[in-house]
A protein has these predicted regions:
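Bacterial N-terminal signal peptides that target proteins for export
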Residues: 1-11
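Signature for the C-terminal beta-barrel architecture of outer-membrane proteins
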Residues: 203-371
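Short loop/turn motifs that connect adjacent beta-strands in outer-membrane beta-barrel proteins
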Residues: 29, 52-56, 75-80, 92-103, ...
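Outer-membrane beta-barrel domain signature
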Residues: 52-53, 117-123, 151-155, 192-195, ...
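N-terminal signal peptide c-region/cleavage motif recognized by signal peptidases
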Residues: 17-21
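Well-ordered mid-protein domain cores that form the structural environment of catalytic cofactors
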Residues: 124-221
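Transmembrane beta-strand segments that form the barrel wall of outer-membrane beta-barrel proteins
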Residues: 104-121, 142-153, 175-183, 187-191, ...
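N-terminal periplasmic/intermembrane-space "pro-region" immediately following the signal or transit peptide
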Residues: 23-122
Length: 371
C-alpha cells in the first residue's frame, strides 16, 4: 500500500488539528515533548527546580515537588523571579493534563521520506501512521491502550501497541508494564543509551516516584536521586531473535548545578543463547566477555554497554547555559567499561521577543574506542 504525497499532507494537517483539540493525559512528561523539556531545563538552570532531568519520562508529581522545594529555599525576590514564562508553561500543561484525565485521542501522520536525523522531539518516520488511544488517570494509577497502524518500509510490523501502558504508585515507587519511549542522557539530538530513535521495548519497569535527597547525614551529599530499572522483550527480527533487554539507570544531583547519571544496559538470552540462572548471574557480574572470562564460544550470556553522563547548569549574566556529555563503554576491561563512544554539547537559552529560544551545539562520536 502506497499513499500519494497530497493525501499524506492532508492526513498530517488533520493530525495537527486533532492533536490541538485533544491532549492525552499522562502522569509524566513524555520523552519527545521538546517544548516541555526546554522549559524544565531552563527552570533547573535558573535554580528554580530541584531534582534530576537526565532520564525521561519525568513524572509531573516530581517536577512540581521540585519546583515547590526550590521556591521554599529561596529569598522572596529570587522566588518571584522563578514565577516566569517557564513555570507558567508547565502549570498550564499540568492543568490541561488534569482536566483530560479520561478520554480518547486520535493521531494521524505521514512523511514522504524518513528524516535524515532524529532528535529528542517526536517526529513521524513512516509514510503513513494512525493511532487511537483510550486513556485514564487517577491519583495513584494511569493506563493507556494505544492501537496503531503503520505503513512504511522500516519493518513488517504494521499493527502496533506502542505507547500502551499500565502504571501505579506504591509508596515512593512507580511500577509499570507496557511500551513507552525512554530517553536516557543529556543530549538534545541524540543519546548513546536509550532514545526514541527506536520503537519502545515492551516490558516491566520500576522507578522512583519522587527523586528526593536521602535523609541520612552519610548520604545527603548525593542530593536528589532517581533509579530506573527495566526488563523488556526484544523482537525476533534481529541477529539474536527474542533476546531480553535489561537496564538500570541511577541519576543523582550532588550540587544544584551538577547532575550525574550512571547507565548499564544488557541484551541477554534469546534463541540459541544461554538464558538460565547461571547465565543471568554471569551477565549481572559482567562475566560475559568470551575473550577474558574463560567462557567457551557461544556461551557469552549477554551483550552489554555501560557508562556515565553529566549536565552542568550555569547562569552567567542570568543566561541559562548547560554543558553536558555522555560516555558509553562498548567493552569491559578490569571490571570497568572500556572502548567508549562519546557525546558532548553546549546549550543556551535566549529571550528574544516575548518568548524564549534554545540554541545548542552537539557532537557525537559513535566509533567505540576512538579515544
Amino acid at each position: 500500500m502506497r499513499l500519494s504525497p497530497s493525501l499524506i499532507r492532508w492526513l498530517g494537517a488533520l493530525c495537527i488539528g486533532l492533536s490541538a483539540s485533544s491532549q492525552a493525559a499522562t502522569p509524566w512528561v513524555q520523552a519527545g515533548d521538546l517544548t516541555a523539556r526546554h522549559h524544565i531545563e531552563a527552570l533547573q538552570s535558573q535554580g528554580c527546580l530541584k531534582g534530576v532531568t537526565l532520564s525521561w519520562p519525568i513524572s509531573w508529581a516530581a517536577l512540581m515537588k521540585g519546583y515547590r522545594l526550590a521556591l521554599a529555599q529561596q529569598a522572596p525576590d529570587q522566588a518571584s523571579a522563578c514565577k516566569n514564562q517557564h513555570s507558567a508553561y508547565l502549570q498550564k500543561a499540568l492543568e490541561a493534563t488534569r482536566q483530560a484525565a479520561t478520554g480518547a485521542q486520535l493521531t494521524l501522520g505521514g512523511a514522504t521520506q524518513e528524516p535524515l536525523y532524529t532528535s529528542f522531539s517526536s517526529q513521524v518516520e513512516d509514510e503513513a501512521t494512525g493511532q487511537i488511544a483510550l486513556y485514564s488517570m487517577g491519583e495513584h494509577w494511569a493506563a493507556n491502550l494505544a492501537v496503531g497502524y503503520v505503513d512504511g518500509e522500516r519493518d513488517d510490523t504494521h499493527l502496533r501497541f506502542d505507547d500502551t501502558y499500565l502504571a501505579g504508585i506504591v509508596g515512593n515507587w512507580q511500577l509499570g508494564v507496557g511500551a513507552i519511549d525512554r530517553w536516557w542522557g543529556p543530549g538534545w539530538q541524540s543519546s548513546l543509551a536509550l532514545s526514541n530513535n527506536a520503537r519502545p521495548v515492551p516490558g516491566l519497569w520500576i522507578s522512583r516516584h519522587m527523586p528526593l535527597a536521602p535523609e541520612s547525614p552519610w548520604l545527603s551529599w548525593i542530593g536528589p536521586w532517581d533509579l530506573q530499572v527495566i526488563a523488556g522483550q526484544l523482537e525476533k527480527d534481529r541477529a539474536v531473535p527474542k533476546a531480553r533487554l535489561l537496564g538500570a539507570r541511577f541519576v543523582f544531583n550532588p550540587l544544584d548545578s551538577l547532575q550525574i547519571g550512571l547507565t548499564r544496559l544488557a541484551q541477554w538470552g534469546g534463541e540459541g543463547r544461554p538464558q538460565d540462572l547461571d547465565a543471568f548471574w554471569n551477565a549481572v557480574i559482567g562475566r560475559d566477555n568470551g575473550q577474558t572470562s574463560g567462557l567457551k564460544e557461544g556461551q557469552d550470556p549477554s551483550n552489554q554497554i555501560a557508562g556515565l553522563d553529566f549536565r552542568l547548569s550555569l547562569t552567567p549574566g542570568d543566561v541559562p547555559v548547560g554543558l553536558y556529555g555522555q560516555f558509553m563503554g562498548e567493552d569491559e576491561a578490569g571490571g570497568m567499561p572500556s572502548k567508549f563512544s562519546s557525546l558532548a554539547g553546549l546549550d543556551m537559552v535566549t529571550g528574544l521577543g516575548q518568548g524564549s529560544q534554545r540554541v545548542f551545539l552537539e557532537a557525537t562520536e559513535t566509533v567505540a574506542g576512538s579515544w
